[in-house]
Amino acid sequence: MGVCVFFPLCLPCPGALTYIREAQFISSWTPADPRHKQLKMFLQRFVTVGGAAIGARSTMGAMGAIGAIGAKGTMNNIGRRMYHPKVIEHYTHPRNVGSMDKTLPNVGTGLVGAPACGDVMRLQIKVNDKTGVIEDVKFKTFGCGSAIASSSYMTELVHGMTLDDAAKIKNTTIAKELSLPPVKLHCSMLAEDAIKAAIKDYKSKRTSTTTLH
Protein backbone atom coordinates (compact mmCIF):
# COMPACT_ATOMS: atom_id res chain seq x y z
CA MET A 1 0.00 0.00 0.00
CA GLY A 2 1.05 3.59 -0.59
CA VAL A 3 1.79 6.05 2.20
CA CYS A 4 -0.33 9.17 2.57
CA VAL A 5 1.74 11.99 1.06
CA PHE A 6 0.01 14.52 3.30
CA PHE A 7 1.08 12.92 6.56
CA PRO A 8 4.26 15.08 6.91
CA LEU A 9 2.14 18.22 6.77
CA CYS A 10 0.57 17.26 10.10
CA LEU A 11 3.87 17.43 11.95
CA PRO A 12 3.53 21.10 13.05
CA CYS A 13 0.42 20.16 15.01
CA PRO A 14 1.17 17.81 17.92
CA GLY A 15 -2.53 17.39 18.55
CA ALA A 16 -3.30 16.30 15.01
CA LEU A 17 -0.20 14.14 14.98
CA THR A 18 -1.42 12.36 18.10
CA TYR A 19 -4.69 11.62 16.41
CA ILE A 20 -3.00 10.31 13.31
CA ARG A 21 -0.71 8.12 15.36
CA GLU A 22 -3.73 6.74 17.16
CA ALA A 23 -5.32 5.89 13.82
CA GLN A 24 -2.45 4.12 12.15
CA PHE A 25 -4.66 3.02 9.32
CA ILE A 26 -4.48 6.54 7.91
CA SER A 27 -0.88 5.99 6.84
CA SER A 28 -1.99 3.17 4.58
CA TRP A 29 -4.47 5.23 2.60
CA THR A 30 -3.74 5.59 -1.10
CA PRO A 31 -4.57 8.70 -3.18
CA ALA A 32 -7.44 6.69 -4.67
CA ASP A 33 -9.05 6.27 -1.27
CA PRO A 34 -11.95 8.74 -0.79
CA ARG A 35 -10.74 9.41 2.75
CA HIS A 36 -7.44 10.64 1.33
CA LYS A 37 -9.25 13.49 -0.41
CA GLN A 38 -11.08 14.34 2.80
CA LEU A 39 -7.79 14.44 4.70
CA LYS A 40 -6.36 16.76 2.06
CA MET A 41 -9.36 19.06 2.45
CA PHE A 42 -8.83 19.05 6.22
CA LEU A 43 -5.19 20.04 5.82
CA GLN A 44 -6.13 22.86 3.47
CA ARG A 45 -8.56 24.19 6.08
CA PHE A 46 -6.03 23.83 8.88
CA VAL A 47 -5.14 27.50 9.20
CA THR A 48 -4.66 29.96 12.04
CA VAL A 49 -7.36 32.50 12.76
CA GLY A 50 -6.31 35.34 15.01
CA GLY A 51 -3.19 33.42 15.90
CA ALA A 52 -5.15 30.71 17.68
CA ALA A 53 -4.81 27.35 16.01
CA ILE A 54 -8.24 27.33 14.46
CA GLY A 55 -9.10 25.34 11.36
CA ALA A 56 -12.74 24.44 10.80
CA ARG A 57 -13.27 26.99 13.63
CA SER A 58 -10.57 25.41 15.78
CA THR A 59 -7.94 22.74 15.74
CA MET A 60 -10.38 20.70 17.76
CA GLY A 61 -12.90 21.21 14.98
CA ALA A 62 -10.31 20.12 12.48
CA MET A 63 -9.49 17.06 14.53
CA GLY A 64 -13.19 16.38 14.53
CA ALA A 65 -12.95 16.38 10.74
CA ILE A 66 -10.38 13.62 10.99
CA GLY A 67 -12.65 11.81 13.39
CA ALA A 68 -15.48 12.01 10.91
CA ILE A 69 -13.48 10.12 8.31
CA GLY A 70 -12.31 7.36 10.65
CA ALA A 71 -13.87 3.94 10.42
CA LYS A 72 -16.86 3.43 12.72
CA GLY A 73 -16.16 6.62 14.67
CA THR A 74 -12.77 5.42 15.91
CA MET A 75 -11.26 8.90 15.93
CA ASN A 76 -14.19 10.50 17.68
CA ASN A 77 -13.94 7.96 20.48
CA ILE A 78 -10.23 8.67 20.82
CA GLY A 79 -10.95 12.38 20.94
CA ARG A 80 -13.48 11.95 23.73
CA ARG A 81 -10.95 10.01 25.76
CA MET A 82 -8.17 12.56 25.21
CA TYR A 83 -10.00 15.82 25.91
CA HIS A 84 -12.15 16.83 28.86
CA PRO A 85 -15.40 18.67 28.00
CA LYS A 86 -14.00 21.86 29.57
CA VAL A 87 -11.03 21.74 27.19
CA ILE A 88 -13.36 21.22 24.25
CA GLU A 89 -15.51 24.16 25.36
CA HIS A 90 -12.56 26.56 25.59
CA TYR A 91 -11.09 25.12 22.40
CA THR A 92 -14.17 25.49 20.26
CA HIS A 93 -15.15 28.82 21.84
CA PRO A 94 -11.85 30.44 22.89
CA ARG A 95 -12.24 33.51 25.07
CA ASN A 96 -10.47 36.81 24.48
CA VAL A 97 -8.67 35.88 21.27
CA GLY A 98 -6.93 38.89 19.79
CA SER A 99 -4.12 41.34 20.31
CA MET A 100 -3.31 44.78 21.67
CA ASP A 101 -0.76 47.38 20.71
CA LYS A 102 2.35 46.12 22.48
CA THR A 103 3.95 49.57 22.30
CA LEU A 104 1.41 51.07 24.71
CA PRO A 105 2.92 51.73 28.15
CA ASN A 106 0.03 50.04 29.98
CA VAL A 107 0.13 46.86 27.88
CA GLY A 108 2.34 43.96 28.89
CA THR A 109 3.15 41.19 26.43
CA GLY A 110 4.32 37.69 27.23
CA LEU A 111 5.54 35.41 24.45
CA VAL A 112 6.49 31.87 25.44
CA GLY A 113 7.03 28.50 23.83
CA ALA A 114 8.85 27.49 20.68
CA PRO A 115 7.60 26.66 17.16
CA ALA A 116 9.89 23.63 17.11
CA CYS A 117 8.03 22.22 20.11
CA GLY A 118 4.64 22.86 18.56
CA ASP A 119 3.22 25.32 21.10
CA VAL A 120 3.64 29.11 21.00
CA MET A 121 1.61 31.31 23.31
CA ARG A 122 1.27 35.10 23.37
CA LEU A 123 -0.70 36.66 26.19
CA GLN A 124 -1.24 40.40 26.62
CA ILE A 125 -2.62 42.35 29.55
CA LYS A 126 -3.90 45.91 29.76
CA VAL A 127 -3.34 47.34 33.22
CA ASN A 128 -4.87 50.28 35.05
CA ASP A 129 -1.77 52.21 36.06
CA LYS A 130 -3.45 53.67 39.16
CA THR A 131 -4.95 50.51 40.63
CA GLY A 132 -2.69 47.83 39.18
CA VAL A 133 -5.76 45.89 38.06
CA ILE A 134 -5.78 43.95 34.79
CA GLU A 135 -8.59 45.54 32.78
CA ASP A 136 -8.27 43.54 29.58
CA VAL A 137 -6.57 40.37 28.38
CA LYS A 138 -5.95 38.97 24.92
CA PHE A 139 -4.18 35.88 23.64
CA LYS A 140 -3.01 34.23 20.47
CA THR A 141 -1.81 30.65 20.60
CA PHE A 142 -0.61 28.11 18.09
CA GLY A 143 -0.69 24.63 19.52
CA CYS A 144 -2.78 21.68 20.57
CA GLY A 145 -6.21 21.80 22.17
CA SER A 146 -4.87 21.86 25.70
CA ALA A 147 -2.57 24.80 24.92
CA ILE A 148 -5.38 26.91 23.53
CA ALA A 149 -7.75 25.92 26.33
CA SER A 150 -5.10 26.80 28.91
CA SER A 151 -4.60 30.22 27.30
CA SER A 152 -8.31 30.87 27.08
CA TYR A 153 -8.94 29.93 30.70
CA MET A 154 -5.99 32.00 31.88
CA THR A 155 -7.46 35.12 30.27
CA GLU A 156 -10.71 34.57 32.14
CA LEU A 157 -8.86 33.92 35.36
CA VAL A 158 -6.68 37.04 35.44
CA HIS A 159 -9.23 39.52 34.13
CA GLY A 160 -10.00 41.90 36.99
CA MET A 161 -7.12 40.66 39.15
CA THR A 162 -4.32 42.80 40.51
CA LEU A 163 -0.86 42.13 39.12
CA ASP A 164 0.23 40.64 42.43
CA ASP A 165 -2.64 38.15 42.47
CA ALA A 166 -2.19 37.24 38.81
CA ALA A 167 1.50 36.57 39.38
CA LYS A 168 0.61 33.99 42.04
CA ILE A 169 -1.40 31.78 39.67
CA LYS A 170 0.14 28.35 39.29
CA ASN A 171 -0.17 25.95 36.40
CA THR A 172 -1.77 23.43 38.76
CA THR A 173 -4.82 25.68 39.05
CA ILE A 174 -5.29 25.58 35.29
CA ALA A 175 -4.54 21.87 35.01
CA LYS A 176 -7.08 21.06 37.71
CA GLU A 177 -9.81 23.23 36.21
CA LEU A 178 -9.36 21.72 32.74
CA SER A 179 -8.63 18.20 34.00
CA LEU A 180 -5.47 18.05 31.91
CA PRO A 181 -3.74 14.67 31.73
CA PRO A 182 -0.06 14.45 32.77
CA VAL A 183 1.07 14.47 29.15
CA LYS A 184 -0.54 17.91 28.69
CA LEU A 185 0.68 19.61 31.86
CA HIS A 186 3.29 21.53 29.87
CA CYS A 187 0.42 23.49 28.29
CA SER A 188 -0.69 24.81 31.67
CA MET A 189 2.94 25.62 32.46
CA LEU A 190 3.13 27.72 29.30
CA ALA A 191 0.07 29.67 30.42
CA GLU A 192 1.70 30.35 33.79
CA ASP A 193 4.91 31.44 32.07
CA ALA A 194 2.93 33.66 29.69
CA ILE A 195 1.15 35.67 32.39
CA LYS A 196 4.38 36.10 34.34
CA ALA A 197 6.17 37.26 31.20
CA ALA A 198 3.38 39.74 30.44
CA ILE A 199 3.53 41.15 33.96
CA LYS A 200 7.30 41.44 33.77
CA ASP A 201 7.05 43.27 30.44
CA TYR A 202 4.51 45.72 31.84
CA LYS A 203 6.61 46.43 34.92
CA SER A 204 9.74 46.96 32.84
CA LYS A 205 7.85 49.56 30.79
CA ARG A 206 6.73 51.30 33.95
CA THR A 207 10.29 51.39 35.21
CA SER A 208 11.52 52.82 31.91
CA THR A 209 8.79 55.46 31.86
CA THR A 210 9.56 56.50 35.44
CA THR A 211 13.26 56.73 34.65
CA LEU A 212 12.62 58.92 31.61
CA HIS A 213 10.58 61.33 33.71
From Swiss-Prot:
Pfam families listed in its UniProt record: NifU_N
Pathway per the UniProt entry: Cofactor biosynthesis; iron-sulfur cluster biosynthesis
Domain of life: Eukaryota
Molecular function terms, GO-annotated: 2 iron, 2 sulfur cluster binding; ATPase activator activity; ferrous iron binding; zinc ion binding
A cellular component term, taken from the record's GO annotations: mitochondrial matrix
One GO-annotated biological process of the protein: tRNA wobble uridine modification
Keywords in alphabetical order: 2Fe-2S, Iron, Iron-sulfur, Metal-binding, Mitochondrion, Transit peptide
Compartmental location: Mitochondrion matrix
Family note: Belongs to the NifU family.
Protein name as it appears in the record: Iron sulfur cluster assembly protein 1, mitochondrial
Organism: Candida glabrata (strain ATCC 2001 / BCRC 20586 / JCM 3761 / NBRC 0622 / NRRL Y-65 / CBS 138)
